[in-house]
Curated annotation (Swiss-Prot):
Effect of mutating Y628C: In SPGF49; uncertain significance
Pfam name, any one: CFAP58_CC
InterPro entries with a match to the protein in the record: CFAP58_CC (IPR049270)
GO biological process, one term: sperm mitochondrial sheath assembly
CC per GO annotation: centrosome; cytoplasm; cytoskeleton; extracellular space; sperm flagellum; sperm midpiece
Family the UniProt entry places it in: Belongs to the CFAP58 family.
Main location: other
Free-text function comment from the UniProt entry: Has an essential role in the assembly and organization of the sperm flagellar axoneme. Required for the elongation of the primary cilium and sperm flagellar midpiece via modulation of the Notch signaling pathway.
Gene source species: Homo sapiens
UniProt keyword annotation of Coiled coil present: yes
Name of the protein: Cilia- and flagella-associated protein 58
Keyword Coiled coil on entry: yes
Reported disease: Spermatogenic failure 49: An autosomal recessive infertility disorder characterized by asthenoteratozoospermia and multiple morphologic abnormalities of the sperm flagella, primarily coiled and short flagella, with markedly reduced or absent motility.
Coiled coil residues, start to end: 106-595, 642-839
Amino acid sequence: MAEEKGGKQVLEESAFEEMERDFQGVLHELSGDKSLEKFRIEYERLHAVMKKSYDNEKRLMAKCRELNAEIVVNSAKVATALKLSQDDQTTIASLKKEIEKAWKMVDSAYDKEQKAKETILALKEEIVNLTKLVEQGSGLSMDQHSNIRDLLRFKEEVTKERDQLLSEVVKLRESLAQTTEQQQETERSKEEAEHAISQFQQEIQQRQNEASREFRKKEKLEKELKQIQADMDSRQTEIKALQQYVQKSKEELQKLEQQLKEQKILNERAAKELEQFQMRNAKLQQENEQHSLVCEQLSQENQQKALELKAKEEEVHQMRLDIGKLNKIREQIHKKLHHTEDQKAEVEQHKETLKNQIVGLEREVEASKKQAELDRKAMDELLRERDILNKNMLKAVNATQKQTDLVKLHEQAKRNLEGEIQNYKDEAQKQRKIIFHLEKERDRYINQASDLTQKVLMNMEDIKVRETQIFDYRKKIAESEIKLKQQQNLYEAVRSDRNLYSKNLVEAQDEITDMKRKLKIMIHQVDELKEDISAKESALVKLHLEQQRIEKEKETLKAELQKLRQQALETKHFIEKQEAEERKLLRIIAEADGERLRQKKELDQVISERDILGSQLVRRNDELALLYEKIKIQQSVLNKGESQYNQRLEDMRILRLEIKKLRREKGILARSMANVEELRQEFFHMQRELLKERTRCRALEEELENPLNVHRWRKLEASDPNAYELIQKIHTLQKRLISKTEEVVEKELLLQEKEKLYMELKHVLARQPGPEAAEQLKLYRRTLHDKKQQLKVLSSELNMYEVQSKEYKYEVEKLTNELQNLKKKYLAQKRKEQLQKNKDTAPMDNTFLMVKPNGPGFTGGGFPLRSTKMTF
């Protein structure tokens, strides 16, 4: 089975590899054709989805195989546990039988104990009678002596039987303890087996749950694949609609071309250019539609990106708020710091200004002192000069007035200087007061500065802590800024893409409007050409230019014809490849149908075997329920037997107490016996009887060692029926033991046969396909559905390409016919032109010279910019 699965897997992998190669070949063929670009993208996406589903399927198949292997292992464990439980049931049954035997033996021992009690009571009565006789003092007769001997002998036999029974009771107790221990061990093993079975059942349930989960995942993937296929079908319908639109546009172009062909030869170039513009317009419209689809997709993506960007912007906004809060805290701290620093700077500046003011005032005081000294010196000099003047007054009469004036001036200056000196003194006094006050303020400011330095140090420590926090916050801000930059880059990329697409859209719209405008211009020019047809004077120039243009168009038509032939060959090759692909797909579908039928047969067989196994499992469960009921019944019986056994033990304890009491009474009686002589005689007789009994015992021992009669135990039937019954029970038990051993051998043979059947069934189950067959069947159905869909798509594409090839053939034929018509018209026009040249050579030259200055202006292909009437 594993080899068959491996072979199937190899075949599936080879088929998948072949499909992969075919896919690559189709992609290679489609990559050269831009018109099938959209189809190629959809095809690649479908192939990616198929590959993903194939990988998921492989993974699920591997997991299913693992689960099946674990289920097989667990089923084997369950089977072994069931086998152990069956063995435990057999041991429990055998132990129950042994317990029943033990209870029977206990019952027989109880009966014997009852008989022994009765004999003990009878002996007590006889002892009482004997004591009475002894008290009466009457002599014993021979009959009484013989009775006493018989009683003593009977007493010894009873004591022997009692000892035997006690030993048997001890043995039975030991065997009962062993059986109880064995039963407990079997119950423990049974509980362990049940626990293991429950664990295995739980594991199987877990595996089944996992398998169901995997199956649900697979169904989900199948639904997704169906959705993708539906999307693909919708895209195919859209492509078909677009192709129909293109076909309609082509038909309209053909109609327009037919209308343009009906025009004259002189307007053919304009008509062809108009046709080219219309074709380009159709292409632009198609591209516009594609751009609109792309724009819609981009708008949807932009909306999604906008939502994501909005979420990111909200995160960024939140982070910015956090950053703003942190910045506010940081700014507050910085403001406080700057405020303290400003206060400190102001204090220091004020201190410096005060120092400068003090130094300046000290300098001014020194300067005033120096000025006062200079004034004094000047006063002395003036006094000396006054003396000199007074002395020389008499010498110079003319200089006296001058000197007096100078003296007045100097005196005025002196008074001024003295006033200034007084002012300076007052100012110096004020300055001393100010200096004293400033020194006080300096001391106060020094104290304030020391306090402020302490505050600054404290603030610096706080600033360091805040700076560490700010550093951490800066790290966070940097990380958030990096994330923000990434989001901004993504946003910029999306915005640039959007701008690019919008720019392309605007350019396309501008081109469309430009083309429409050019189309209107061309229509207007065509109208002008229609009006200028009557202008015969420009025919020669136009025909000459038209000839060159026709030659060029002929070359272009040849190139287009060659291109169309090449495209026709390519489409033919593509159609052949598609036909080969179709044949291959049909072959694969036939193989899949055969495989599906085979898998269906195997599935039916597996279902029938599953039903058989289910019925066997139900039967086994019923048997287990019956065994559990029997075990409960046996447990209740064991509990009852244990209680009865405890009761018997209590009875034996009571009997022991009674025996002790009897012995004590016997001792009392022996001490109370007054007649020693009789006791001696009795002792003598007892010794003689003891010798007789010893000789008898010796003879019996010799007879036992060398038995003369093998079936001597049959004599006990009359003498000792209890011993006879015991011997018969032993014989019957031996026979039953032999029969039970034979039954055990038969059961072992049956067990071996059952094990063989179990192993064969296990091998059959191992050969049968599991849930993998159903999975493979689903896979084949899905692949068959996919292939049918692909076949439909390929057939539709084939029809489309056939229609296109027919259209190309029709266009080629049409172009060849047009080329022939153009050649004919060109030759006819050439003949007419030659005839016209031969007829009107000189007049045309004169008219040409006359017309040329006032003729219409031409640009490009000879289209007139204004219409003027020409006169010949």
